[in-house]
């Protein structure tokens, strides 16, 4: 019997009356458990009659084949509806919302208030400055949990683990997350110009920058912006409009280069530690470390640096900073005056750079001038304005014998 498309559509609508909705919902409730993972922004389901061993009792992402399988079961059960109708019901407000981070934390037993589980985990890494490492790791770890649980919180700190290859840095880092959260871990740098990388700030908990060795100065400038980024504004492939997503990711890095920092202006976001040894085989007490971190967070623990702590951090980070030749040569050929000095000069940055360029074989350009000015400010050389309005710096211009004496000759 021939029927036109209009007739077929009307017949389908007739089949999909409200009774069909109730039949379908009853069937879904008795055969499946659906939830919407708000971190990954995806539907997940559990089939109560699952036959595949790896998925028995476990939820998994809803795929196109999942809809097809559900549609087939509905037809076999005598519930007549279209595949699009099934998709519309499943991908609606029907599934419960699920946050894997709050779900895990809320099921933990409260911390006993005594046992330092985070400190015990930190002790599995032995460093050249153990006190700095333990303090910085505690701050970063609590900040990581804050970033995961609190919509307004942002972890501005980046742990950097330095050692030669083969110490197990990446393995140790990967084990910071419990098995339930392993899919929220990622290896790789975060490119602020890459939309997918930006979205990962919302869908991942730890981003391990294993390629930190190869980061250029321009890369680090973009990385600093990303580290402090509060939210992600992008349009996903299947969305019709640009949306704002909560930032949840925290950064950690591993490097084989001791001098891994480059910014002369300060590196207070970075927490570098020189690793002597790592124990990545002892089981991690996930319940303990996360219950303690949650208690510290709720108790108002300060997981960021401020005031004198920042000054101490910057002094520590100097041991891991690659100094620019302009900065190093400034301290070779000039110094700050002492009260008893009589041969004091007031010189503009360009004049200072001219001498450095001659003796230090440094190219004179805008970048060199900028680096020199930053260096003069960093070491707090006194300044004044001359009659022409240019800035001059108070220096002692070292003579050859003084320069050679500085080299130990």
Predicted regions and their residues:
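Conserved AAA+/SF3 P-loop NTPase catalytic/coupling segment centered on the Walker-B
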Residues: 204-228, 261-266
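Conserved catalytic/switch belt of AAA+ P-loop NTPases
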Residues: 220-243
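A short helix-turn-beta junction within AAA+ P-loop NTPase domains corresponding to the substrate/partner-engaging
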Residues: 261-280
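Long, low-complexity, charged/polar intrinsically disordered regions in eukaryotic proteins
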Residues: 282-317
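DNA transaction DNA-binding modules
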Residues: 304-409
